[in-house]
UniProtKB/Swiss-Prot annotation:
Free-text comment about domains: MORN domains promote interaction with ARC6 and CDP1/PARC6 but prevent binding to FTSZ1, FTSZ2, MIND and MINE proteins.
Annotated segments matching region Disordered: 444-465, 539-558
BP GO terms, sorted: chloroplast fission; plastid organization
Membrane topology of this protein: Peripheral membrane protein
Pfam family, any one: MORN
Record protein name field: Protein ACCUMULATION AND REPLICATION OF CHLOROPLASTS 3, chloroplastic
Gene that this sequence comes from: ARC3
Deleted gene: phenotype: Small number of abnormally large and heterogeneous chloroplasts sometimes exhibiting alteration in stromule length and frequency in non-green tissues (e.g. slightly increased stromule frequency in hypocotyl epidermal cells). Normal shape and number of etioplasts in cotyledons. Misexpression and mislocalization of ADT2. Formation of multiple MCD1 and MIND1-containing ring structures in dividing chloroplasts, instead of single ring. Slow trunover of FtsZ ring subunits (e.g. FTSZ2-1, FTSZ2-2 and FTSZ1) in contractile rings at the chloroplast midpoint.
């Protein structure tokens, strides 16, 4: 029976991804084209080509490994996990669908006498506890030792480093997997992990770095989803190193215009020792080309344009057994997709339990501790334009395949570079760019920010232009203080626009008041010590823009003249349905009937975009009479899919819609710099959410029908943590908690 697959948390992935699939990433292979011996002996400084490695294996039953272990013919690969997330990491690794790998998982604990011992973590069915002295573990001469470390490891690092040092000095491979903390966990924990990384450089052969902060920066994901993705990435790295080190699988080198050559196990070890760092990217598709594109563009762990790049490693997993001729087919497909002609090291992973016709591609980006100083002939200079080139070329193709897979109608609308300009009163609004990429991509450049940002927080100055090679994009909705945005056309108009109480109310949204999810009751927190604190926060936000009628009372003759002709006779049609009136407008102008992009009056505003049957369908923008703007996808005349709503006071919502209501995951960017991410159900926040205040405070918790409900975790600017209990928007209790709780 095929293993069930579930969608990953990456926002642009559409094909199911096996949530616990431990893909087998391999490691860098520096070589020249002279011969196998020269390839393996050259240093990373001499490497001048991109390497792509895959792994070919047939899954062996678990009994095979057990018999090998009993005979002593196959040593175990020991995995030691330390840090505050060790339990969840080991749970994820033990749920891996690759039981044939000779892995044993350990944690550090104390025995009855107070001495340190290693406690083995077994699968969920086996409740027996097995312990071992670290000296006994070293005497068993493990083939390799893998340390997985997250923040909060405490004194466990001392024993872990001692074991790593002993394993490496004994001639075996010592590998480290570092899981960096989220930025909201505080600078202290980040410095803690960085300090451990510096120590491990002296005691390990190879280190895999996993920065989980990018999960929250680049994707519309909850904290729980981000943690699961981070654990899956750790499991992938562990299984990859284990598969290579165990020697259970064949590895092949492919040189252009030559046959494949198989690598020996000792050669693989030499290869692994030649690099110091690696980063990961992976994707899933129903064909090899799509999975490769998604591994490059959709995985937040991989960023196109990395400068410390020495080699790329590709692993392709499928449910059908692949032979040597199939490996050549993969090579040919890879070269055609990536337009790459260099030497390649290639194979695949055979996993019978994987869903049929599913291809899982994993990239590993490897770098060396030695930094290249010359740009001439450097692999960096050759790779960055290469990645940017294929990025521009295949992004539209990937979006098209995704839309077809979802049953959406692909729409192609001509782009316009002047989409955000507002013309004078005697001109119409210029044709603007209606592209779903505007809903997905933002710039990372935020040096001009009006408000200071923490390290690692994304920012934005303007929308991306895919033709600009200096701009990076990672295919997911990003978030940043709204003060950094260059507003689209209509924003300057709405600042002085006189509110129109007509049909605009049908599509306009009410302004969200801060703090979010809190009932405006005078009795709120009257008996709590934090009453003054909440009152202070509320007072700081008592400005006119929270009043729906506050910021739009002053009218502008210029703004009124600009769109007066567009709205002159629309009030006469209010007795007609929206569909009938829009069809009449389309028929009155014969020149517009044959245009793929229509401009018409629609439900109290000016719509410009794709239409079908007189109703918006596809991509389009609606400028409402009160100055608010919706820019995004439409279906049957209603907002559906990805879209951005610009409030008349400067706030912005960016996320998913259904039947004219916010439905799904989305971000609110308040124009004062606060940010709020939440899951929405029919227009109301429901489920997990998080709030980032401009002052640096962070709130995590759950919402119910738009109100805070249940437990909330609050982290102040100085790192102090508070646990709050809310009941339908009313604060019940608040107490300080320890950082380790």
């Amino acid at each position: 029976m095929p293993i069930s697959m579930e969608l990953p948390v990456f926002s642009t992935l559409r094909v199911p991804l096996f949530s616990r699939l431990a893909l087998l990433p391999t490691f860098g292979v520096p070589f020249s084209s002279l011969g196998a011996t020269t390839r393996l002996n050259c240093t990373s400084r001499k490497a001048r080509r991109i390497c792509v490695m895959c792994l070919v294996r047939d899954s062996a039953p678990i009994e095979t490994c057990e018999r090998a272990g009993e005979d002593g013919s196959d040593e175990f690969i020991e995995v030691l996990v330390i840090g505050s997330r060790k339990e969840s990491i080991m749970d994820s690794c033990l749920d891996s669908p690759f039981p044939s790998l000779p892995l044993r998982f350990w944690s550090i604990s104390k025995d009855s006498s107070g001495g340190l011992v290693l406690q083995q973590r077994l699968n969920h069915q086996d409740n027996a506890l097995k312990t071992m002295n670290p000296i006994e573990l070293l005497q068993s001469r493990p083939r390799a030792f893998i340390l997985v470390a997250s923040a909060g490891y405490g004194s466990d690092q001392v024993e872990a480093i001692n074991i790593l040092s002993a394993v490496r000095s004994g001639g075996n491979l010592a590998v480290a997997v570092l899981l960096k903390p989220f930025s909201f966990e505080g600078r202290k924990r980040l410095e803690e992990v960085n300090e451990l990384a510096r120590k491990l450089q002296q005691h390990t052969n190879f280190c895999i770095d996993i920065d989980i902060e990018v999960l929250l920066q680049k994707d519309l994901v909850t904290l729980d989803e981000a943690l699961r993705n981070a654990n899956n990435a750790v499991s992938m790295a562990i299984n990859a190193a284990s598969a290579l080190i165990s020697g259970m699988h064949g590895n092949f080198i492919d040189v252009m215009h030559k046959d494949l050559k198989e690598l020996e196990g000792s050669e693989v070890k030499t290869i692994l020792e030649s690099y110091k760092e690696a980063k990961v990217g992976f994707g899933v598709g129903h064909n090899l080309k799509t999975s490769i594109l998604r591994a490059i563009y959709d995985c937040p762990f991989f960023r196109p344009g990395l400068k410390d790049l020495n080699a790329i490693i590709c692993i392709v997993a499928s449910s059908v057994p692949l032979q040597k001729k199939d490996v050549k087919t993969i090579l040919r497909t890879f070269r055609q997709t990536m337009e790459y002609t260099g030497d390649i090291i290639v194979s695949t992973v055979h996993e019978p339990d994987l869903e049929p016709k599913v291809r899982v591609t994993t990239f590993f980006i490897l770098s060396s501790s030695e930094v290249e100083t010359s740009n001439k002939g450097n692999i960096f200079s050759g790779l960055v334009p290469f990645v940017l080139n294929i990025f521009t070329r295949y992004r539209s193709q990937l979006q098209k395949e995704t839309n077809i897979g979802l049953g959406e109608t692909p729409v192609s609308i001509k782009d316009s570079a002047d989409s955000t300009d507002v013309k004078t009163s005697n001109q119409n609004i210029e044709e603007f760019e209606i592209d779903s990429e505007d809903l997905l991509e933002v710039s990372e450049n935020g040096d001009d920010s009006e408000y200071p940002l923490k390290e690692g927080e994304p920012s934005r100055n303007s929308r991306l232009d895919l033709k600009d090679e200096n701009v990076e994009d990672f295919g997911a909705i990003q978030r940043e203080p709204i003060a950094n945005w260059s507003m689209d056309q209509g924003y300057q108009i709405e600042q002085k626009w006189q509110a129109d109480s007509g049909d605009t109310a049908v599509l306009s949204l009410g302004i969200v008041n801060l703090p979010v999810g809190v009932r405006p009751s005078k009795k709120l927190n009257s008996n709590l010590s934090v009453a003054s604190q909440l009152s202070r926060k509320a007072d700081s936000r008592e400005e006119s823009f929270f009043n729906p009628n506050g910021s739009t009372k002053d009218s502008s003759d210029t703004a009124s003249t600009l769109l007066s002709e567009k709205y002159a006779d629309f009030t006469k049609q209010r007795n007609l349905s929206a569909r009938a009136s829009s069809m009449l407008e389309a028929e009155r102008d014969s020149s517009k009937r044959w245009s793929p992009i229509l401009e018409m009056q629609y439900r109290g505003g000016l719509f410009k975009g794709r239409c079908q049957g007189g109703l918006p369908e596809g991509k389009g923008r609606l400028v409402l009479g009160d100055g608010s703007i919706y820019d995004g996808m439409w279906h049957n005349g209603k907002r559906s899919g990805l879209g951005t709503f610009y409030f008349k006071n400067g706030d912005v919502f960016q996320g998913t819609w259904r039947e004219d209501l916010i439905h799904g995951k989305g971000w609110f960017y308040f124009h004062k710099g606060d940010r709020w991410f939440a899951n929405f159900w029919k227009g109301k926040a429901s489920g997990e959410g998080r709030f980032y205040s401009k002052s640096g405070e962070i709130f995590f918790g759950h919402f119910k029908d738009g109100w805070r409900h249940g437990q909330f975790l609050c982290i102040d600017l100085d790192g102090t943590r508070y646990s709050e209990t809310w009941d339908d928007g009313v604060l019940i209790d608040r107490k300080q908690v320890d950082a380790g709780d």
